[in-house]
Amino acid sequence: MGQKVHPYGFRLGYTKPWKSRWFIERDYDKLLLEDVKLKAELKEKLKSAGVSSIEVERPGNKLRIIIRTARPGIIIGRKGAEIDKLKGELQKRTNREVYIDIQEVHKPELDAQLVAESIALQLEKRVGFRRAMRKSVDSALRFGCKGIKVRVSGRLNGNEIARSEWYLQGRLPLHTLRADIDYGFAEARTTYGVIGVKAWVYKGEILPAAKKREPQVATAGNF
């Protein structure tokens, strides 16, 4: 039976960057655990802001957090009150100078994580899974994606036996490294149990920049 590699990890260092960027010689495990907890807590706290991803950088003794979100106004707050409050809480907890960068996701319909969370939210509101899947796929295609696949797994419609169903439109070249494929996962907590939602969005190919030709230096042998 064929196994699937994680689309982001497969392209890591080739077309996708690391989501935690820092180096330390000692106590690596402590900083890694701090990163994991920090991302999980921020994701839960900013649930209503439509957070796509959280990246962490640690230049020196500072902490820089990059949050990609569909609704930046919720995080920033009126006159920056909410973001200042969040920054203060993080500084007190980590004992570091904290910088928070907010990056807006202009097309949430093409962000795989937000697509998966949108479907999960609809399932929690008792919307039919086929209707929720088709609606998200149609929206993504309308906004210009080259291909999209959505998969839901669990006790669909409250059935006794768990199963998986998926819906695919367009192209999805998972084994092409230069393909810009975004991947997202979310969970819908329904009265029948947890339903897992996965989304793959293909946005096109990332082509390397054309190399500039270096001018040839004339030597005695060229004359």
Curated annotation (Swiss-Prot):
Q: List the disulfide bonds.
A: none
Which controlled-vocabulary keywords does the entry list? Ribonucleoprotein, Ribosomal protein, RNA-binding, rRNA-binding
The molecular function GO annotations come to: mRNA binding; rRNA binding; structural constituent of ribosome
Q: What's the domain of life for this entry?
A: Bacteria
The residues covered by the KH type-2 domain are 38-106
Against PROSITE patterns, the record matches this protein to: KH_TYPE_2, RIBOSOMAL_S3
UniProt-listed GO biological process terms:
translation
List cellular component terms (GO): cytosolic small ribosomal subunit
What does the record give as the function of this protein? Binds the lower part of the 30S subunit head. Binds mRNA in the 70S ribosome, positioning it for translation.
Q: What is this protein called?
A: Small ribosomal subunit protein uS3
Q: Which species is listed as the source?
A: Koribacter versatilis (strain Ellin345)
Q: Which gene encodes it?
A: rpsC
